[in-house]
């Protein structure tokens, strides 16, 4: 056997590093090309709705609401989000040299969270540079997403009272807790006990400082209120014992990381995690789960939704029905073609400094994407055949797609399954819209989309 040359260990390391760098460059190139092509494609395929005359309609819109309505955001929450970088700087200051390097650190961490996630250390946020990059960029964007979702959830989504218990699993820098405080002012007056669980004690400690600073700026309306919730930090991962039973359990951007170390089938992972969640839950517990808008996460959300329904809970949002998920992302982890549930909203109202930081890091965002579910105790609608019903609720899931004949469509979710909503007359429709229709023709007579097989509803 040939003896290893003394320098081989160094050249191999250098080669591995070079391969990683080349992989990263290629990823950047392909991603930038994708978004450039998409933007150019959208520009080319603008539909001239003035040319659409006398197109027969399948349905008439009775009502419309959007699950990311910017106008539902509290004014003080918007001010905090706009100045979030200043809040972080007061708690975890960076010098000019570190600030100059921040965009590069953000981009490097972005790779660890995406194309390099398989080799990422699970305790990545214990590193100083990575924690700073995460809080100053990813936490900021997550707050933008989560506050928009929380502010638009139904008014009865958080039936919490004084001394109610909240358990936030995978807390990181307490992003969910901070977002909930900002987006739901009625909860600021409550004496809540919030257990925050994460494997990184230092990350939670920084997050608690951020939360307390935010609570001092976005104050409770009741002058006699405590002014903040009681935070109890628990070091550990899901399954770690907590003696109190929860009235609300939240998890954001946590379950997708399980795929890094759990190679069971998604169904088995969901079975395991639903048991873990219910081990913490009281009888009246509600659940909120949010994950990144990517196929594997969308598939997992759909599996958890199925299990919540089996447990007798109702889905308060985002689904317009309690039936089987028609966009369940089956085989998503293997690149399957099935549609998967994720929503997006425009970043035009995002904090200006955050948008600028995104540009500096080479990660421009025109859309914020999220997959989520809110499940709570309540009566489930009877599972009867509603296919000929005069009214139909649909949730617009996709961004606009361009169909043959210069038409514009949106893949959407309904109690009858996936449908393709065809926008014939230039109505303002976007992902996250929940539309109530009156059907003008029998559902069974609708034309089918050739690509997906979904019934087309022209409005």
Where are these regions (language model features)?
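C-terminal lobe and adjacent flexible extensions of AdoMet/dcAdoMet transferase-like proteins
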Residues: 349-459
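A short SAM/SAH-binding and catalytic strip from SAM-dependent methyltransferases
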Residues: 247-267
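Class I SAM-dependent methyltransferase Rossmann-like catalytic core
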Residues: 120-156
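Class I S-adenosyl-L-methionine
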Residues: 298-302, 306, 313-377
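Conserved SAM-binding loop of SAM-dependent methyltransferases across substrates and taxa
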Residues: 173-189
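Conserved beta-strand signature within the Rossmann-like core of class I S-adenosyl-L-methionine
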Residues: 283-291
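S-adenosyl-L-methionine
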Residues: 206-243
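N-terminal auxiliary segments of SAM/dcSAM-dependent transferases
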Residues: 4-17, 23-120
């Amino acid at each position: 056997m040939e003896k290893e040359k003394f320098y081989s260990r160094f050249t191999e390391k250098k080669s591995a590093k070079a391969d990683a760098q080349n992989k990263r460059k290629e990823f950047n190139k392909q991603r930038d090309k994708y978004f450039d092509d998409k933007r150019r494609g959208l520009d080319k395929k603008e539909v001239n709705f003035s040319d659409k005359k006398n197109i027969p309609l399948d349905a008439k819109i009775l009502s419309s609401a959007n699950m990311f309505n910017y106008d539902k955001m509290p004014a003080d929450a918007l001010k905090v989000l706009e100045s979030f970088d200043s809040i972080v700087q007061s708690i975890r200051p960076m010098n000019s040299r570190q600030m100059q390097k921040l965009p590069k650190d953000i981009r490097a961490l972005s790779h660890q969270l995406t194309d390099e996630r398989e080799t990422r250390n699970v305790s990545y946020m214990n590193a100083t540079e990575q924690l700073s990059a995460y809080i100053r960029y990813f936490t900021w964007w997550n707050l933008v997403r989560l506050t928009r979702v929380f502010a638009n959830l139904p008014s009865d989504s958080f039936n919490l009272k004084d001394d109610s218990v909240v358990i936030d699993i995978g807390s990181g820098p307490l992003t969910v807790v901070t977002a909930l405080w900002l987006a739901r002012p009625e909860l600021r007056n409550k004496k809540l006990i919030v257990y925050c669980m994460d494997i990184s004690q230092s990350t939670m400690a920084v997050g608690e400082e951020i939360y307390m600073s935010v609570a001092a700026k976005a104050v409770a309306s009741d002058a006699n209120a405590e002014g903040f919730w009681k935070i109890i930090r628990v070091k550990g991962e899901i399954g770690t014992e907590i003696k109190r039973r929860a009235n609300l359990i939240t998890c954001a951007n946590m379950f997708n990381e399980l795929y890094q170390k759990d190679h069971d089938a998604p169904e088995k992972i969901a079975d395991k995690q639903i048991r873990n969640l219910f081990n913490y839950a009281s009888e009246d517990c509600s659940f909120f789960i949010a994950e990144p808008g990517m196929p594997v996460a969308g598939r997992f959300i759909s599996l958890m939704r199925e299990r919540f329904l089996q447990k007798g809970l109702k889905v308060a949002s985002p689904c317009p029905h309690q039936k089987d998920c028609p966009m369940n992302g089956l085989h998503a982890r293997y690149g399957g073609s099935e549609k998967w549930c994720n929503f997006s909203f425009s970043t035009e109202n995002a904090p200006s400094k955050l948008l600028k930081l995104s540009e500096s890091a080479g990660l421009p965002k025109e859309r914020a994407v999220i997959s989520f579910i809110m499940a709570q105790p309540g009566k489930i609608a009877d599972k009867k055949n509603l296919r000929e019903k005069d009214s139909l609720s649909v949730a617009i899931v996709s961004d606009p797609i361009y169909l043959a004949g210069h038409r514009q469509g949106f893949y959407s979710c309904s109690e009858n399954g996936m449908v393709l909503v065809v926008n014939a007359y230039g109505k303002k429709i976007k992902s996250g819209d929940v539309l109530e229709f009156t059907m003008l023709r029998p559902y069974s007579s609708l034309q089918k989309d050739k690509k997906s097989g979904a019934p087309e509803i022209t409005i």
